[in-house]
């Protein structure tokens, strides 16, 4: 699914975006953000982040730097310690 979504964005970049004036208010561009979000967070959350970003790309938003948030790693130690302190 990730490959299909990223492929769609790349088609947009190659066949649509390059022939239109640059209008993205952010860096990285919304399409580059979408690709990175999907690569980092997977198809579902990455698509959500990309759609949320695109919804902010309009003349009434100041734009600017807006990077994909890092993926939160599950902390096995904290889960383990929670179980150790749980009383039955």
From Swiss-Prot:
It is found in: Cell membrane. Signal peptide: none annotated. Its main location: membrane. InterPro entries: Membr_insert_effic_factor_YidD. It is a peripheral membrane protein. The keyword Membrane applies. Residues 66-88 are annotated as: Disordered. Keywords: Cell membrane, Membrane. One of its GO terms (cellular component) is plasma membrane. It comes from the Bacteria. Could be involved in insertion of integral membrane proteins into the membrane. Belongs to the UPF0161 family. This is Putative membrane protein insertion efficiency factor.
């Amino acid at each position: 699914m990730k490959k299909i979504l990223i492929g769609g964005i790349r088609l947009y970049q190659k066949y649509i975006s390059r022939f239109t004036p640059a209008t993205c208010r952010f860096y990285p561009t919304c399409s580059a953000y979408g690709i990175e979000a999907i690569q980092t967070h997977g198809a579902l959350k990455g698509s959500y982040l990309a759609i949320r970003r695109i919804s902010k790309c309009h003349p009434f938003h100041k734009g600017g730097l807006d990077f994909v948030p890092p993926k939160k790693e599950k902390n096995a130690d904290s889960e383990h310690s929670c179980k150790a302190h749980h009383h039955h």
